[in-house]
Amino acid sequence: MKKIKCALIGPGNIGTDLLAKLKRSSVLEPVWMVGIDPESEGLNRARELGIKTTAEGVDGLLPHVLADGVQIAFDATSAYVHAENARKLNALGVMMIDLTPAAIGPYCVPPVNLKEHLGKREMNVNMVTCGGQATIPMVAAVSRVQPVAYGEIVATVSSRSVGPGTRKNIDEFTRTTAGAVEKVGGARKGKAIIIINPAEPPLMMRDTIHCLTETEPDQQRIAESIHAMIEEVQKYVPGYRLVNGPVFDGKRVTVFMEVAGLGDYLPTYAGNLDIMTAAAARTAEMFAEEMIAGNLTLEPVVA
């Protein structure tokens, strides 16, 4: 079976977890891992898996893109450098899956809007944030039943699972997640809060989703919609679980979720890594299937 060759930029927690998932993919083949520190654990791990590596950043990858047939690149670095990375790789006809909160391209939350991206030939799609991937499906589950005036999400993650890149991007995280709660989740106004909990042993990712509906909530239809959406997310993140809810209080609908990871890189408490990397892999696989079927040809983008 033909596989689409991929590069990963950023060998941190997210990049390393994503590499494990891509190694299992039937349509994606990771061939390059890009970093900036030759001694980094992520680059060493990639080398051990037989992946080509460079410690010279994206510039170290560019000369090899065409020779090695790289067609999709995953950026798991930082919002600050994503624009430059995307510009350089798009110019060579490489599609970008953006796992930073840069959000240059349109937001993608697979169970909600993955199919919409298919015919649009986008060269850059943004995976929002781990908090966004865990909570926006629940906001969308309510908003597809009736209008949501306000959606607020609180993502609680273990300190150990949050690397230096994510810490530098906290403001971007909250802005990008709130924007996607509105654009993808369907809330008229969105707000996002992230809590990084230093408890030891590390706690599992927990997410609280509040929605204020414009009219009295249709409790039965909302509950059915939420359970159906949870099943959709579980197709690619089996550890996505309803802890409590939906709880109805006047026009407020609250859902409490927990996300366990597969333990590919960090232990299972780091569900925040899994929900992000599994969503990114799922998105890339859909585009790869279209490429293999001959329905999608990537074109260089001149910035």
UniProtKB/Swiss-Prot annotation:
Binding site for NAD(+): 161-169, 272
Active-site residues per Swiss-Prot or TrEMBL entry: 130 (acyl-thioester intermediate)
Database matches in Pfam families: AcetDehyd-dimer (PF09290)
SUPFAM superfamilies according to UniProt: Glyceraldehyde-3-phosphate dehydrogenase-like, C-terminal domain, NAD(P)-binding Rossmann-fold domains
GO biological process, one term: catabolic process
Keyword DNA repair: no
Cross-referenced InterPro entries: Acetaldehyde_dehydrogenase (IPR003361), Acetylaldehyde_DH_C (IPR015426), NAD(P)-bd_dom_sf (IPR036291), Semialdehyde_DH_NAD-bd (IPR000534)
EC annotation from Swiss-Prot or TrEMBL: 1.2.1.10
Catalytic activity: acetaldehyde + NAD(+) + CoA = acetyl-CoA + NADH + H(+)
Keywords: Aromatic hydrocarbons catabolism, NAD, Oxidoreductase
GO molecular function, one term: acetaldehyde dehydrogenase (acetylating) activity
Enzyme class: oxidoreductase
HAMAP family reported for this sequence: Ac_ald_DH_ac
Family under the similarity heading: Belongs to the acetaldehyde dehydrogenase family.
Name the record gives this protein: Acetaldehyde dehydrogenase 1
